[in-house]
Amino acid sequence: MRRYAILGATGNTGQALLNVLLQSPDNQIHAYCRSASKLNRLRPEISQHRQVKVWEGSLEDVSLLSECIRGTRAVFMVVAIPDNMPHCTIAQDCTNAVLNTLKKLQAEGCQSLPKLIVLSSASLEDSLCADVPPLIHRVLNIAAGNLYSDLAKAEKILRAEKHWVSTTFVKPGGLVHDVQRGHTLSTKTAKTPVSFLDVAAGMVEIADMDDKTYDMMNVSVNAIGDGTAFPWKGVYYVLTGLLFHFFPWTYKYFGDSPMPKPRKDL
């Protein structure tokens, strides 16, 4: 029986991971979220599901987070927001919380630490986006620049800990809600679009590998064949992302989440 922890279980990728992992009756899932009531609204069956245990809390609660992560094979770090929030530090906050938790587990005598499977973006790697026209790539980087900056800083933190933490950075192209069509893993190119379900399946495949094939590597998940729906919602987020980039104060009125205050320590 394999145990996995999902950090960000109420998000799009977190929900997709639940779907993929529950395809096997042998998987045990530790779902961590800020709001158990939201998770129950999204998945009413979860509260009584024998394969799922839910932890409700903040990332700052290292004791609770350690209980969620303890004994798992892999931790899926998919805490995210969909829009270009100014001063975003959610990826860095999650990374620091997980590292503090792993240090706690080590201090308590834990002999085997889980892999970290981190959801990132292909836009951080020019090599994965070689097929994207330069102008479009530039626009996308501006429209999600705050998120990408946060992801890049979080990745730098994790790479500095490579001597004791095993991490894989999953960097897909544009994500969309669609059926699971099958996927391939690639370290050379990222194709858009790809469904959340296919990305989740790719993340699980990486987690289940017994070797360190993708340790500290950038890996994209690509859909097999054609037919994946066009990410029309992504167009909306590009437009609002440009708005938030040039006029950050507008996020207070049109953003998806409460706007954080700038932090001087990051």
Swiss-Prot record:
The keyword Membrane does not apply. InterPro entries: NAD(P)-bd_dom, NAD(P)-bd_dom_sf. It comes from the Eukaryota. Keywords: Monooxygenase, Oxidoreductase. Its EC number is 1.-.-.-. Pathway: Mycotoxin biosynthesis; aflatoxin biosynthesis. PANTHER family: FLAVIN REDUCTASE-RELATED (PTHR15020), UPF0659 PROTEIN YMR090W (PTHR15020:SF50). Oxidoreductase; part of the gene cluster that mediates the biosynthesis of aflatoxins, a group of polyketide-derived furanocoumarins, and part of the most toxic and carcinogenic compounds among the known mycotoxins. The four major aflatoxins produced by A.parasiticus are aflatoxin B1 (AFB1), aflatoxin B2 (AFB2), aflatoxin G1 (AFG1) and aflatoxin G2 (AFG2). Belongs to the avfA family. This is Oxidoreductase aflX. It comes from Aspergillus parasiticus (strain ATCC 56775 / NRRL 5862 / SRRC 143 / SU-1). The gene is aflX.
